[in-house]
């Protein structure tokens, strides 16, 4: 499921993040790439162990914790610490698939995270740079994504994707992976659609007896499918 989630960051949070990142020391982005993707990757990235990356990542995690849409769509079990990248001067990232397992360096690299869901949080206004579209190959064909600053897009970690060359300005973004309680993307989609329907029915027909039954169906499916 490819899903844009608007306004994950407030204007104040976005301003705080950009103030931190604008004065940060960036490194070669290939430091976090696997063997295959390193050959296609050309960008700058904040070192994972830098103080700026840790502080900025904590702010992003706080914002995600307040997003009911993110929780409903992803059903997160573990979130890999958010990373930050920057593209400018023609830099790009060719087609690749994210590594299936990431090792959380903040925990000494001992804890594996299965990358069920990939996510990009845009931090640059789309009018401030040319190019830089996130191009994702999914079930319905090729999707090109370029969202306003503060907006998030999530998509299956199994997706073939790329970042187009940035020919003007700079594209700054946060990216991370989530291990879901449900490893199956089809199950996540079904539960998300069911949750959205229950929320809408709750608004349209509050107190309807069927809502209790539907909510029970949701939780029983989650109980049956969840890997916790």
UniProtKB/Swiss-Prot annotation:
E.C. no: 1.14.11.-
Keyword NADP among record annotations: no
Annotated keywords: Dioxygenase, Iron, Metal-binding, Oxidoreductase, Vitamin C
Key word Isomerase present: no
MF-aspect GO terms: 2-oxoglutarate-dependent dioxygenase activity; iron ion binding; L-ascorbic acid binding
Entry's cofactor comment: Binds 1 Fe(2+) ion per subunit.
Classification via Gene3D superfamilies: q2cbj1_9rhob like domain (2.60.120.620), Rabenosyn, Rab binding domain (4.10.860.20)
Protein name, as recorded: PKHD-type hydroxylase XCV3086
Biological source species: Xanthomonas euvesicatoria pv. vesicatoria (strain 85-10) (Xanthomonas campestris pv. vesicatoria)
